[in-house]
Amino acid sequence: MCSIGEDDFGDEGAAHAMVVEALPLGIVLSPGNCSKCDVNSNELYKLNFREAECRECFLAYARHKFRAALGAAKILPRNAEVLLVLDGSAKSLVLLDMLHFAQTQNTFKRLHCNVHVVYVEEQHVQDRDPVGLEDLLSVSRQYAPFEFYVIELGQGCSLQRIKDYSPSLKANNELIYKLQKLQSLTARQDYLQQHRKNLICSVAQSLHCTHVFESNISVDLATQLLTAIALGRGASAALDVALLDDRLSGDVKLLRPLKDLSEQEITFYIHAQRLKPLFQNGSHYGMERGQTASIQNLTSAFVANLQQNYASTVSTVFRTGDKIAVNSNPEQASCVHCRSALDSELSDTLLAIEYSRSVSEAGVSLNKNEKDLEGLAKKRLEKQDGLCHACRTIQAEFDSGNLL
């Protein structure tokens, strides 16, 4: 298995292949010679900082990035049980197609693992019509012999084989009820992300999978890094953007093998393989509310603007996340909700936040002195509720009930 290095793939494609932009970026439909193999092609693919190349050379380049990400760290043992998370987006179909291709190679190049695919149905949470069952069946037939399953977000016991799947009633979804009880869209989106991660972990354990593949690409991870810091999850931000995330329970490991791919490469791959996404990107929960509706929406819009106008800056953000180290302490307790390390030390920042919250809750009937309020803030931080700071913030927004 190959490994990836700075010389092979720089911040914007291949650093060693930087050229003056003579051709427009994108898919050039006029015939020409491939810069790699010199074969005449009717369809050339022009990536940033790369010469125009034919379909076969582009696919080899993109698939090499996928294999190199796994090979660099050698984190996927032979014959591992892998759960691939499919959400119907273009990038998840690209991951599925790449993994299927890697499974169909000869013995020397074959990626030796046993693959299960789970489609996470979350359209009902967004109050949208679910993806057609026939479309899902078509995908499962195309990528046989992978085993396909379906599970609905908010329905932990709804895991079914795709051939046996029947949608459950929306009225029975407890997740929708919990989301309605949260006051801000920021808290809802954060809670939904953590809930989804825990649901996928439970599916992996049910299917006896030791590794989970998610389809996050570079721009997603740049957004996630900034969002995590803004939400008070900075201590675990490194794991949010790393190739390997080992916070899931039951020794399940989360892998992001597409982390080095860009949006442009995903678009080209979809075109080259004639794949049909089940829905378009940008349909995440709450995105239709506008850019300023939540911290997540605002950060996503900010990164999208950077990607459009200063593409190398986005790559710098993403690569910075790669360089952040996690303070690993085996004896440190973990948050019962997000599995991140607990904020065990009493910091001035957290104390100031809880102090402000205590003052706000006291309101106009404030009759406590400064020391009483500071003592109350310290008690809150020392309370053994098993939640990190970010998850306590979500808990504080519940009108009633418990986060878990």
Curated annotation (Swiss-Prot):
Keywords: Cytoplasm, tRNA processing
Protein name: Cytoplasmic tRNA 2-thiolation protein 2
GO CC aspect terms: cytosol
Stated role: Plays a central role in 2-thiolation of mcm(5)S(2)U at tRNA wobble positions of tRNA(Lys), tRNA(Glu) and tRNA(Gln). May act by forming a heterodimer with NCS6/CTU1 that ligates sulfur from thiocarboxylated URM1 onto the uridine of tRNAs at wobble position.
GO MF annotation list: nucleotidyltransferase activity; sulfurtransferase activity; tRNA binding
Gene3D superfamilies: HUPs
Pathway terms, separated by semicolons: tRNA modification; 5-methoxycarbonylmethyl-2-thiouridine-tRNA biosynthesis
Main location: cytoplasm
Any one Pfam family match given in the protein's UniProt record, by short name: CTU2
One GO BP annotation of this record: tRNA thio-modification
UniProt key word tRNA processing: yes
Localisation per UniProt entry: Cytoplasm
Disulfide bonds, paired cysteine numbers: none
Organism: Drosophila yakuba (Fruit fly)
Family, as annotated: Belongs to the CTU2/NCS2 family.
